[in-house]
């Protein structure tokens, strides 16, 4: 009986080994595929963050010329101008790069600084309605067109960033992505707060035609 059982035992052992090898191959393929998907979405978040920062910088670059143009009108409210300059300086004090959004404290500070800047610009534009001569200024009108474009691009870029982060953060909480994220050190990304998400749904209106 021993001589007959040996071939049968060897057959099942070979089957077991083949099955284990196939299982390991499948697990390996799944893990590699999961890693590639996480890496892809991580890069999408980085790209979205980079685009958002670029659009914020474009708006920031418009402010000095806007302030200098408005300063030419002596009766213009100086406090409003000071608020804009101060808000711009607050943004400039933060070390900005795409890794910024991986630090919740820095991201919150940067988000608040940008929100404050947007609000101060809105007040500046609202008060400008009182000054027909300022609104008729060609340079001012050109700056308004550029600012309107900047605000629209910021709104789009922020929306894309929020969606990219949502997708990434959801993915790394799901199996088997969560295992890969832990092993490879992929952490949760910082997203905008609910308050800011509501704010971006309404693009600031820049209108000098009235």
Model segments located where?
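A helix-centric hydrophobic-segment signal that preferentially recognizes long
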Residues: 9-210
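Extreme N-terminal basic, low-complexity initiation segments
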Residues: 2-8
């Amino acid at each position: 009986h021993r001589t007959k059982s040996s071939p049968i035992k060897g057959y099942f052992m070979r089957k077991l080994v083949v099955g284990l090898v196939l299982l390991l191959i499948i697990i390996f393929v799944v893990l590699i595929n999961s890693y590639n998907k996480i890496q892809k979405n991580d890069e999408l978040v980085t790209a979205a963050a980079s685009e958002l920062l670029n659009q914020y910088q474009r708006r920031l670059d418009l402010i000095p010329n806007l302030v200098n143009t408005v300063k030419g009108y002596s009766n213009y409210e100086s406090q409003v101008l000071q608020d804009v300059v101060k808000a711009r300086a607050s943004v400039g004090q933060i070390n900005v790069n795409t890794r910024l959004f991986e630090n919740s404290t820095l991201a919150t500070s940067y988000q608040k600084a940008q929100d404050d800047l947007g609000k101060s610009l809105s007040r500046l534009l609202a008060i400008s309605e009182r000054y027909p001569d300022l609104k008729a200024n060609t340079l001012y009108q050109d700056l308004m067109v550029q600012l309107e474009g900047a605000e629209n691009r910021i709104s789009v870029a922020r929306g894309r960033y929020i969606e990219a982060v949502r997708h990434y953060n959801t993915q790394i909480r799901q199996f088997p992505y969560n295992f890969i994220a832990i092993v490879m050190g992929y952490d949760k990304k910082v997203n905008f707060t609910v308050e800011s998400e509501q704010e971006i749904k309404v693009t600031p209106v820049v209108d000098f035609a009235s």
